[in-house]
């Protein structure tokens, strides 16, 4: 990487040297032409005493034209110089597109990554942005790899638009690698090959929340209310960190159960933070977890993340898959939020709760209060939704964590 940066530095210095040489030649010609004009004007002025009135007028016009020409030449030269200097500064500030592994963890080496990627890896799942794999390094470390979809939607690999997306993605990955929170997936390394990126994360043995909830529906896994509430609190604490604790506010843009990973203790970790805004395949992707303002007017704020969280909290409370119709009643509107609101207004909120976790009266009261929080998060108006900071306080009040 150091050698690559040296080559980039050498090419930048060569470019600057050529431009400086151009400036010297250009301005030497400009100064020569200006001095010639001055000599012409001087010669004309010495002969003007013996000139006729007509010749005097011609001489005056020549002098004016020479002065105007000199001023215009100076202005054009200044503009060209300013443009070139700005271009040089912009070029030097550009992030170089790195190739090969970029590692952020001392437990991983570029060599071990290359070797593991070349061998067989186990497919775990996929979404619009790419596929997830399980991979074992030569030191025995188990990691998860997400191979992002190709950047084919932004032109050829060497086009300026493709390079721009790669630079933005690279900057985003470097930003994500610096985030440290127990409820965020830590980026350990990434590899760029041609127009594809492979992201390396810690391996989560319980998979995604989507995987677990599917197993709950088929009765392969039991997930009590205490664990579900812990998952909800962990998700919103991750959002709180992104929204309020980072130097620059970070939005998730694609919060849904497939992007919530669960460790061995069912502690949630948010994955793919911010990547959806960069990947071309996600620009038009809208799911039932997307806030109405993001799908209707392409506006996205921290309150849009809160809407997505409200959908996840609704899934945890009801156990239902929001992509399936909830009931035949027209009053429900066919969406999770409208269905929950309808039951709340009709005094039948208990009917929405997952029957497999109903039992103790105290837990049932907590679930009903959480249902009210869900409905607020799913408001059509962003200003009516609570912030992630407020949600942490609201949810932790339901139970002692």
Curated annotation (Swiss-Prot):
Q: For this UniProt entry, what is the primary localization, expressed as one broad class?
A: membrane
User: Looking at the keywords, is Cell inner membrane present?
Assistant: no
InterPro entries tied to this protein: Kinase-like_dom_sf, LRR_receptor-like_kinase, Prot_kinase_dom
Gene Ontology molecular function, alphabetical: ATP binding; peptide receptor activity; receptor serine/threonine kinase binding; signaling receptor binding
Q: What is this protein called?
A: Inactive leucine-rich repeat receptor-like protein kinase CORYNE
**Keywords, in A-Z order:** ATP-binding, Cell membrane, Endoplasmic reticulum, Membrane, Nucleotide-binding, Signal, Transmembrane, Transmembrane helix
* Residues that bind ATP: 124-132, 146
Q: What does this protein do?
A: Involved in the perception of CLV3 and CLV3-like (CLE) peptides, that act as extracellular signals regulating meristem maintenance. Modulates root, shoot and flower apical meristem maintenance and floral organ development regulation, probably via CLAVATA (CLV)-like pathways involving at least CLV3 and CLE19. In complex with CLV2, perceives secreted CLV3-like effector proteins from plant-parasitic cyst nematodes as ligand mimics of the plant CLE signaling pathway. This recognition is required for proper feeding structure (syncytium) development and ultimately successful nematode infection.
Q: How does it assemble?
A: Self-interacts. Parts of a tetrameric complex made of two CLV2/CRN heterodimers that can interact with CLV3 and CLE peptides. CLV2/CRN heterodimer interacts with CLV1 homodimers. Interacts with CLV1 and CLV2. CLV2/CRN heterodimer can interact with BAM3.
């Amino acid at each position: 990487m150091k050698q690559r940066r040296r080559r980039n530095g050498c090419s930048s210095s060569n470019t600057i040297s050529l431009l400086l040489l151009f400036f010297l030649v250009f301005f030497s010609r400009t100064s020569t032409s200006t001095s010639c004009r001055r000599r012409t004007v001087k010669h004309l002025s010495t002969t003007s005493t013996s000139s006729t009135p007509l010749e005097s007028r011609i001489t005056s016009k020549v002098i004016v034209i020479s002065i105007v020409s000199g001023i215009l030449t100076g202005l054009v030269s200044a503009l060209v110089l300013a443009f070139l200097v700005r271009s040089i500064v912009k070029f030097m500030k550009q992030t170089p597109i790195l190739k090969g592994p970029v590692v952020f963890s001392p437990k991983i080496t570029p060599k071990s990554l290359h070797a593991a990627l070349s061998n067989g890896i186990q497919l775990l799942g996929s979404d619009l942005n790419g596929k997830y794999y399980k991979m074992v390094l030569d030191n025995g470390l188990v990691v998860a790899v997400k191979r992002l979809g190709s950047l084919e939607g932004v032109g050829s690999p060497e086009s300026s638009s493709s390079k721009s997306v790669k630079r933005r993605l690279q900057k985003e990955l470097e930003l994500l690698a610096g985030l440290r929170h127990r409820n965020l997936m830590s980026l350990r390394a990434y590899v760029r090959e041609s127009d594809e990126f492979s992201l390396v994360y810690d391996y989560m043995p319980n998979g995604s929340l989507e995987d677990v909830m599917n197993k709950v529906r088929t009765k392969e896994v039991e997930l009590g209310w205490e664990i579900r509430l812990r998952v909800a609190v962990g998700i919103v604490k991750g959002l709180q960190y992104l929204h309020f604790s980072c130097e620059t506010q970070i939005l998730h843009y694609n919060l849904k159960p497939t992007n919530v990973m669960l460790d061995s203790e069912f502690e949630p970790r948010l994955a793919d933070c911010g990547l959806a805004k960069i990947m071309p395949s996600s620009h038009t992707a809208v799911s039932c977890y997307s806030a109405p303002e993001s799908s209707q007017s392409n506006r996205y704020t921290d309150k849009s993340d809160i809407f997505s969280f409200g959908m996840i909290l609704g899934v945890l409370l009801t156990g239902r898959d929001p992509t399936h119709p909830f009931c035949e009643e027209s009053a429900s509107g066919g969406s999770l939020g409208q269905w929950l609101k309808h039951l709340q207004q009709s005094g039948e909120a208990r009917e929405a709760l997952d029957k497999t976790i109903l039992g103790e009266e105290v837990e049932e009261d907590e679930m009903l209060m959480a249902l009210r929080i869900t409905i607020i998060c799913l408001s059509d108006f962003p200003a009516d939704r609570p912030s992630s900071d407020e949600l942490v306080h609201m949810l932790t009040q339901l139970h002692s964590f």
